[in-house]
UniProtKB/Swiss-Prot annotation:
<dbReference type="GO" id="GO:0005829">
    <property type="term" value="C:cytosol"/>
</dbReference>
<comment type="function">
    <text>Could be a mediator in iron transactions between iron acquisition and iron-requiring processes, such as synthesis and/or repair of Fe-S clusters in biosynthetic enzymes.</text>
</comment>
<dbReference type="GO" id="GO:0005506">
    <property type="term" value="F:iron ion binding"/>
</dbReference>
<comment type="similarity">
    <text>Belongs to the Fe(2+)-trafficking protein family.</text>
</comment>
<dbReference type="GO" id="GO:0034599">
    <property type="term" value="P:cellular response to oxidative stress"/>
</dbReference>
<protein>
    <recommendedName>
        <fullName>Probable Fe(2+)-trafficking protein</fullName>
    </recommendedName>
</protein>
<dbReference type="InterPro" id="IPR007457">
    <property type="entry name" value="Fe_traffick_prot_YggX"/>
</dbReference>
<dbReference type="InterPro" id="IPR036766">
    <property type="entry name" value="Fe_traffick_prot_YggX_sf"/>
</dbReference>
<dbReference type="Pfam" id="PF04362">
    <property type="entry name" value="Iron_traffic"/>
</dbReference>
<keyword id="KW-0408">Iron</keyword>
Length: 92
């Protein structure tokens, strides 16, 4: 049976993550209070951040930026989008 958490992002009790996503305090907070569903939303947001900011995994600043964005996404009022971000056209 999945471990349940009261998801801070989605506001309801849902299955939690199987492990801490990061080996730091933020990773523990996410593990304790973020659901698998919210984590899937983060992964999509994460890809957008990497692309829009043109971040390189080899750059040490990338990790710092991603941790800041994850903190804001999960625990802030609203995640900030990159200044020049344009959402993809809707499929329809």
């Amino acid at each position: 049976m999945a471990r349940m958490v009261m998801c801070k992002k989605l506001g309801r009790e849902l299955p939690g993550l199987a492990y801490k996503p990061f080996p730091n305090e933020l990773g523990q907070r996410i593990y304790d209070s973020i659901s698998q569903d919210a984590w899937k939303l983060w992964l999509e947001h994460f890809k957008m951040i990497l692309n829009e900011y043109r971040l390189s995994p080899a750059d040490p600043r990338t990790t710092e930026i991603l941790f800041q964005q994850a903190e804001q996404f999960f625990f802030g009022e609203n995640a900030q989008l990159p200044p020049d971000y344009r959402p993809p056209p809707s499929k329809g």
